[in-house]
C-alpha cells in the first residue's frame, strides 16, 4: 500500500473539493490519506470494526441514516464507502465522511468514490 499513499493524498484533496465532503483513504488497517478534515486526527489512526465489516462485504456502502465511524476517535459518520480491490484482494477503502453539515451524498459523489477506488486499485496491481 506504500505505493498508493504517494498519490492518495492528492486524490483525496481533489475528491474532497469535488464532493464537499471529507475524504479518507485507508489501507486494511489505517488511514493513509485525508482531506477536508484535520489530518492529525485521522492519519495513521486505526480503522473501526464497523468499517472492517463494510469493506469485507466488497460492496459499495451508502449511509441510510446510520452514524458509523470509520476511524478510531473520529466522530464524523461514513456517508459513502467503497472498497479498493486489487487483483481480487481487498487492499483498502475510499470513504466520504460528514463535513460541516453535509451528511448525504448525491449520485455524482457516489460515482466519484467508486471511480477513486477503482483507480487506486489499478495503481497497485
Regions found by a protein language model. Give the residues of each.
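Juxtadomain coupling helices with adjacent low-complexity linkers
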Residues: 1-18, 47-52, 93, 97-125
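A short beta-strand signature within small-molecule sensing/ligand-binding domains used
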Residues: 73-85
Amino acid at each position: 500500500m506504500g505505493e498508493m499513499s504517494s498519490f492518495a493524498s492528492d486524490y483525496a484533496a481533489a475528491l474532497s473539493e469535488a464532493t464537499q465532503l471529507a475524504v479518507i483513504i485507508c489501507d486494511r488497517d489505517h488511514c493513509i490519506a485525508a482531506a477536508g478534515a484535520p489530518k492529525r486526527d485521522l492519519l495513521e489512526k486505526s480503522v473501526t470494526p464497523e468499517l472492517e465489516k463494510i469493506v469485507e462485504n466488497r460492496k459499495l456502502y451508502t449511509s441510510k441514516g446510520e452514524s458509523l465511524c470509520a476511524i478510531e476517535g473520529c466522530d464524523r459518520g461514513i456517508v459513502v464507502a467503497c472498497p479498493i480491490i486489487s487483483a481480487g484482494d481487498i487492499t483498502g477503502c475510499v470513504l466520504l465522511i460528514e463535513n460541516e453539515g453535509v451528511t448525504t451524498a448525491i449520485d455524482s459523489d457516489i460515482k466519484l468514490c467508486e471511480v477513486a477506488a477503482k483507480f487506486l486499485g489499478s495503481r497497485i496491481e
